[in-house]
Amino acid sequence: VRQLLDSKQAWAGRMWYRIPQEKPFLLSAPELRMLLPGWEGPNGCLATDHITVLGKPVGWCYRERPDGQYPDSGWRFFSGEEDDAYVNDVSHVGVYDLNTICNYDPDIIPLLSAPFGTAYARGEDGKFHAEPFEAPEGP
């Protein structure tokens, strides 16, 4: 994930805005609805293929303070089933618009205004609960 964030190509190339077509995404562009019409601020985020390709719900997410150079909201979304090797392979992580990930899992919408430095895990009850969070270290 850190490698993707540090890649000027990903952000500068505006990958966060368009949907790459090389992966078999669960949802196609015409299926996406506008779920965040009043969102203000940067709307880029990271999500794994567990969510966008396999269709698993978000199980864990966190918001870190972005460097401000790109339209990054700071949100990172995972199913919670990924291991370190999976997440560290940038081919399994993509840069997306927050609205896109909300289409995959609308349950995250109430979390999006949380401050930087927060994390949430989905409990056995199916609801998100705040978790302690330590920002990942740089490259």
Each language-model region and where it sits:
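Acidic, proline/glycine-rich low-complexity IDRs
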Residues: 1-54, 58, 62-139
